[in-house]
Swiss-Prot record:
Lipid attachment in record (S-geranylgeranyl cysteine): C226
Record lineage: Eukaryota, Amoebozoa, Evosea, Eumycetozoa, Dictyostelia
One GO term (biological process): signal transduction
Alphabetical list of NCBIfam families matching this protein: small_GTP
Organism: Dictyostelium discoideum
Positions occupied by motif Effector region: 62-70
Post-translational modification Cysteine methyl ester, affected residues: C226
Compartment(s) where it occurs, according to its Swiss-Prot or TrEMBL record: Cell membrane
EC number: 3.6.5.2
InterPro entries listed in its UniProt record: P-loop_NTPase (IPR027417), Small_GTP-bd (IPR005225), Small_GTPase (IPR001806), Small_GTPase_Ras-type (IPR020849)
Domain of life, per lineage: Eukaryota
Pfam family, one: Ras
Name of the protein in its database record: Ras-like protein rasV
């Protein structure tokens, strides 16, 4: 049986009233675009989570995605950001496209369904692919367990999700796209993850420059001594 996959490019900019406060939010942030990639197995609700965040709307039907792009403005820690969200395919036959998606983004949200153990197990594979493509293991990644409203169909416990996330250094939440539980919080935390990593990288780079600067005079002095000898 073949699956007809539609690809609609959605470039939407929406103000999120839950996070934006015109009096407190700084709209002059120069680095205000945060590129997020939503990844996970097919059918876990990646599009449902994204659509609920973007337009407060729950998608009841399953229409497999190739690549959908969304934009939304939010305020995090009194700073305004535009989220550039890439909703990606989970189908195995489209795995070749993932490398390109990964390279285009700076933060990642890995989605599994609490009602499907195999989708939870696949999180490791998605994370490994991200690390392989970007060639670094400090990528801002968070993991979310969707469909938390389906308590009677649960196959993955909250503890299992939290333990895996902690072991791999990822932020973690359980969410429900259907009743909008923790949806805004996911994207708020995703921005924080990206910005924390950026700040750590900035501090690390600054320390490296200081160390190099301090080493140069010593190296010069040693060379002078060697010449004299």
């Amino acid at each position: 049986m073949s699956i007809k996959i539609k690809n609609f490019k959605k470039n939407i900019i929406i103000n999120n009233n839950n996070f934006i406060n015109e009096n407190n939010c700084n709209n002059n942030n120069k680095n205000n675009i945060v590129q997020l990639c939503i990844m996970g197995d097919g059918g876990v609700g990646k599009t449902a989570v994204t659509t609920q965040f973007i337009s407060n709307h729950f998608v009841y039907y399953y229409d497999p995605t190739i690549e959908d792009s969304y934009r939304k403005q939010i305020c995090v820690s009194d700073k305004s950001y535009i989220l550039d969200i890439l909703d990606t395919a989970g189908q195995d036959e489209l795995t070749a496209m993932r490398d390109q998606w990964i390279r285009s983004c700076e933060g990642f949200v890995l989605v599994y369904s609490i009602t499907c153990k195999s989708s939870f197990n696949q999180v490791l594979n998605f994370r490994e692919q991200i690390i392989r493509v970007l060639d670094r293991d400090d990528v801002p990644i968070m993991m979310i367990g969707n469909k938390s409203d389906l308590v009677n169909e649960r196959q993955v416990t909250y503890h299992e999700g939290k333990e895996l996330a902690q072991r791999l250094g990822m932020s973690f939440m359980e969410v429900s796209a259907k009743n909008r539980s923790n949806i805004d919080e996911v994207f708020h935390e995703a921005v924080c993850c990206v910005k924390r990593k950026e700040e750590l990288y900035r501090i690390k780079s600054k320390h490296v420059k200081i160390l190099k600067k301090n080493k140069n005079p010593l190296k010069k002095k040693i060379n002078e001594i060697c010449k004299v000898m």
